[in-house]
Amino acid sequence: MKFETKCLHAGYNPKNGEPRVQPIVQSTTYTYDSAEEIGKLFDLQAAGYFYTRLANPTTNAAEEKITALEGGVATMCTASGQSAVFYAMLNILEAGDHFISSSYVYGGTYNLFAHTFKKMGIEVTFVDQDLPLEELKKAIRPNTKAVFAETIANPALRVLDIEKFAALAKAAEAPLLVDNTFATPYFCRPIEFGANVVIHSTSKYLDGHAIALGGSITDGGNFNWNNGKYPQLSTPDQTYHGLVYTETFGPAAYIVKARVQLMRDLGAAPAPQNSFLLNVGMETLALRMQRHYENAQAVAEFLEKHPQVAKVNYPGLSSSPDYALKQKYLPNGLCGVISFEIKGGKETAAKWLNALQMTSREVHVADIRTCALHPATSTHRQLSEAELEQAGISAGLIRLSCGIENIQDILADLEQAFAAAK
């Protein structure tokens, strides 16, 4: 099936007399005819549902759809994008481990890596993703267990050289985990370029309507967990009577462990209602992303010529330093998110934001309505001046998420805000 068809049909195939649309299974638990059947479920000897924290039919439909769209082997949905990043990393990291991350990451991800993981005894090295591969390799240590980056960085809008980072991960004998939230699988499928795990904040473009909080982790099924560095997957798990994930579940070992161990113990499971809304949102993903891209490209070109704008970050512009990477990894389009530096810094940025009329001021991003934000005083507020600089966030940087409204209405609102900010 082609991508657009998968958006509609993957994950749920109703049989004779069943609902045409995946129903909401609003139940915490499930009944069985015998105690033996339940016992097999708990020992992972049989597939099925026994508690919604671990699995739910509505959520499973969303997971299977995401797996099909990303080209992986299995997916686990979570209650939020932040919990997806946390679980994806914690599934293979423990006290004493080290990992490498691009410095161009979302503020919440930066805080998780730099501060929360530090309290857990896990150390990160942030690297400049523009450095040559041989320079990046200098960050590798014997205990390096993962490499992390974002396909399109939030909010710097830098495009990742996925193949270069895949080579870095291979040199470290570690998996490459990529947050594909901004690109979506419609424009880029990182697994095809060497990524091993793909993460989403499904609250963004996959849902598309800012109505359902959620996250997802997709296992590419293409990493060798038996290389001696990941005993969590390749040696017996005593909580399941000595089960070895790599032996029992093969290519899906990573995601099964995340579900039956991390979700079991930490419990950031999505609500069935949110999974239903995510399923509905993904049905129109291809149509929405095309409109987001068209609007953002037009807005970026408008901003690039505007006298009150110092700089525009959008890889779709031929003047962008990442234009060649965009052509390689995202040849058919980009997200609807732009960031730009307004002349006058923080004070002028506030005036511009306050003057917006149709465009809303909000923390969210990547949904059907146009919205704007000042990262330095919101999503990245906890970062120091040095950390902000490392992440590419200046005092005058504004993040603009272009919705699917008529482009003339978007441009008119932006222009009147510029006039008010003079």
Show which residues each predicted segment covers:
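Conserved small-domain helix->loop->beta segment predominantly found in fold-type I
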Residues: 266-269, 273-275, 280, 284, ...
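Glycine-centered tight turns that cap/initiate beta-strands
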Residues: 71, 143, 308-311, 396
